Amino acid sequence: MLVAVGLNQKGATVADREVLALPSEELLDALTAFQALDGVDEVAIVSTCYRVEIFAAARCPAAAELSLRHALEARAGRSLPLFELQGEEAFRHLVRVASSLESAILGEPQILGQVKDAFHRAAEAGAAGKELASVLSRALAAAKRVRTETAVGRAGVSWGNAAAALASKVLGPLAGRRVAVIGAGEMARLTAQHMRDERASVVVLNRTLANAEALAAEVGGEARPLDALEQELLRADVVVSAAPAAPAALAPAVMQRILHARRKRIVMVDLAVPRAIPAETGALPDVYLCDVDDLDRVMKAAMAERAQAAQHAERIADEEVQKFARAEAERRAAPLIQEMRSRASAIAREEVERTLRRLGEDPELAKRLDAMAGSIVSKILHAPSTRLRQAVCDGGANDPLVAAAVQIFDLSAAPAARGDAA
């Protein structure tokens, strides 16, 4: 059975998380130690800035949970706000993690790769085998559905993302477009990063060239002094003003002359409050001026889209958990159903052989009687098998129907109850 034990940003502080942080050079030793714990068969560790979570295939889930808790708290040297999950709930958590539904920023793309890498490294170390490989495959399939069927990974909510979205509405894709960012503060940095992520060519202009150079180095762009702005306006497709006061080059008269020379559209984004770019500049032909109110509307729409996407993603997670539960029920019920079918088939075969001894050897008749007996066994046991699978899914060995089947058919095999050995 799948077991998950760990902590994350939702219930643990940075201080709690950092005492469990696993540097890559310690991962192999940790995997070996955790796999050797009581009740644990296979193990993988997802360790990021926001979480340290252990996923284990356990022959005895209760023992595995206890031993993993003790091991983690021993590593920390104190008690920790650890969560403990089993079976379907452990799988649900893994799906939510891989789909970024548990992330600090909904939709962030890094976690899927981190989960995949964690399980692959565990497999390479010999700590994870077939059971965790199957769990990972199902979780990744669920995460892929969330990414492709919802807007969870597409609806960004930030000033920079909103600025990029507005510019894209006017100019189309920003890849290869030239974006001039005026200023080198936090708003300038965030917007420059988003423009870079859109594969735009970013140039940073600032009164203090050293600050422009630092930001340009961070985003892989160019740095120019602010007095080069008028020259830059002849080339830029997008201008982002993240400075408290607009340079003289953005005045209506100057911009009119620049527009006459450049003869193409330009998007201007004013991030200042009070607004720094004159409204008269925004009224010029081929100028598309956006201010913080425009950005706010885009952000609110993105937030609404993201909330709707999250609801859709939760429904997908529910569907995938149900698939997982059915597969687990099939696996747990298989020994019971197999024994029941084997006994019935053996009885049918004995009766066929007894009939053939009376009727004499006839290969064609034997073939037909075997087929008939097999068909009878399958049809008689189809409904009981279906009911038993559902009973195992609902309650495992504790379900009255399962107990009754074991008694009625005198079976030795029985599925594990939830929380017992898998």
Curated annotation (Swiss-Prot):
<feature type="site" description="Important for activity">
    <location>
        <position position="93"/>
    </location>
</feature>
<dbReference type="GO" id="GO:0008883">
    <property type="term" value="F:glutamyl-tRNA reductase activity"/>
</dbReference>
<feature type="binding site">
    <location>
        <begin position="108"/>
        <end position="110"/>
    </location>
    <ligand>
        <name>substrate</name>
    </ligand>
</feature>
<dbReference type="InterPro" id="IPR036291">
    <property type="entry name" value="NAD(P)-bd_dom_sf"/>
</dbReference>
<comment type="function">
    <text>Catalyzes the NADPH-dependent reduction of glutamyl-tRNA(Glu) to glutamate 1-semialdehyde (GSA).</text>
</comment>
<keyword id="KW-0521">NADP</keyword>
<keyword id="KW-0560">Oxidoreductase</keyword>
<dbReference type="Pfam" id="PF01488">
    <property type="entry name" value="Shikimate_DH"/>
</dbReference>
<feature type="binding site">
    <location>
        <position position="103"/>
    </location>
    <ligand>
        <name>substrate</name>
    </ligand>
</feature>
<dbReference type="InterPro" id="IPR006151">
    <property type="entry name" value="Shikm_DH/Glu-tRNA_Rdtase"/>
</dbReference>
<feature type="active site" description="Nucleophile">
    <location>
        <position position="49"/>
    </location>
</feature>
<comment type="similarity">
    <text>Belongs to the glutamyl-tRNA reductase family.</text>
</comment>
<dbReference type="Pfam" id="PF00745">
    <property type="entry name" value="GlutR_dimer"/>
</dbReference>
<feature type="binding site">
    <location>
        <begin position="183"/>
        <end position="188"/>
    </location>
    <ligand>
        <name>NADP(+)</name>
    </ligand>
</feature>
<dbReference type="InterPro" id="IPR000343">
    <property type="entry name" value="4pyrrol_synth_GluRdtase"/>
</dbReference>
<dbReference type="InterPro" id="IPR015896">
    <property type="entry name" value="4pyrrol_synth_GluRdtase_dimer"/>
</dbReference>
<comment type="subunit">
    <text>Homodimer.</text>
</comment>
<dbReference type="Pfam" id="PF05201">
    <property type="entry name" value="GlutR_N"/>
</dbReference>
<comment type="pathway">
    <text>Porphyrin-containing compound metabolism; protoporphyrin-IX biosynthesis; 5-aminolevulinate from L-glutamyl-tRNA(Glu): step 1/2.</text>
</comment>
<dbReference type="InterPro" id="IPR036453">
    <property type="entry name" value="GluRdtase_dimer_dom_sf"/>
</dbReference>
<keyword id="KW-0627">Porphyrin biosynthesis</keyword>
<feature type="binding site">
    <location>
        <begin position="48"/>
        <end position="51"/>
    </location>
    <ligand>
        <name>substrate</name>
    </ligand>
</feature>
<protein>
    <recommendedName>
        <fullName>Glutamyl-tRNA reductase 1</fullName>
        <ecNumber>1.2.1.70</ecNumber>
    </recommendedName>
</protein>
<dbReference type="GO" id="GO:0050661">
    <property type="term" value="F:NADP binding"/>
</dbReference>
<feature type="binding site">
    <location>
        <position position="114"/>
    </location>
    <ligand>
        <name>substrate</name>
    </ligand>
</feature>
<dbReference type="GO" id="GO:0019353">
    <property type="term" value="P:protoporphyrinogen IX biosynthetic process from glutamate"/>
</dbReference>
<dbReference type="InterPro" id="IPR036343">
    <property type="entry name" value="GluRdtase_N_sf"/>
</dbReference>
<dbReference type="InterPro" id="IPR015895">
    <property type="entry name" value="4pyrrol_synth_GluRdtase_N"/>
</dbReference>
<dbReference type="InterPro" id="IPR018214">
    <property type="entry name" value="GluRdtase_CS"/>
</dbReference>
